[in-house]
Structure formats: structure tokens, C-alpha cells
Amino acid sequence: LSFEVIRNDLNQSYSVTPIEVCDYPLILTGDSAVNAFADGNSIYMTQGMMDFATADDELALVIAHELAHNAMRHIDAKRTNAMGGLVIDILIGVLTGVDTQGMFTQNFAQAHSQEFESEADYVGLYMCEISGYDITDAAYFWRRMGVKHPGSIEQNHAATHPSSPERFVSIED
């Protein structure tokens, strides 16, 4: 596999022989949004995130965070939570005729989301540290993400991620 990385106006060419060491493939999408996510089977990173990261340590941090979601089975837990909500949606529909429009399914799926994100931050940092990546500026990476996505700065009951200040302080500790 050969590829080229452009960082700080420098072109670097790499050639690697892939070996399977992890059961979660990393898939790069062409999307310009600054985002990465895990689905329980794979890790997805957008071109926007690749462009946003200023160092390999930051990319490792993002990948490790998403890997932690998969390794800690957060996606499976969300699916299980959603099933509980689905049962309630169905019962209300059958017993009252009211269409909840999946409200309970959606709300139950988001149960513990902020805790899952905090755990993925912690486990991801640990993975980076034991892998030899520099995590000194990890909190500042998340601060930059907060500036890029101002909606993540404030906390509210519907948020799926901790607020940016909460995340920054948690990682700094």
C-alpha cells in the first residue's frame, strides 16, 4: 500500500505492507466534515478529520478513542438500550394507539452516551500512552475540537458527548 501525506506543505510518501493486527478496520471517507466514529465493527475517519489533525499523535488519539468504543462494546450497549425503548414504544402504541414516533427508542439509545464518551476518552488515552504516542497535548486537541464545533462547548440533557470544558478538565486530570 502506497500513499502520500501532505502536512505543513510537505509531501511525504509512504509504502507499507498491511498486516491484520486488529479486527476493526479503519475506513477513510472523503467527507470534509471533521468527524470520526465507530460502528462496533469498523472505525471511520473523514478527510476533514485528517486535515484538522496537526500531528500523527492527534490522529492516533482519534483512532484510539473510536477503537475504545468498539473494544468496550459501547455500540452493542446502545443497541441493547434502544431495544428497551422499542418495547415501550410498541406497548404504548398497542395499549393506547398513540404513535410515539420512536421517541423512547431514540432516548434509550442515548442512555449513558456521555459516560461512554468519557470512558472512550480515558481508554483511548491509555491506548495511546502504552503505544508510545505523546498525549501531552491531548486535552488541547479536544479544546480545538470545541472551537471547531461550538455547539459542543455547552452541556445539556440531550448532548451525547461531554461538554468541551468538561472533557478538557477530565483529560487534564
Predicted regions and their residues:
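A Zn2+-metalloprotease active-site environment signal
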Residues: 1-173
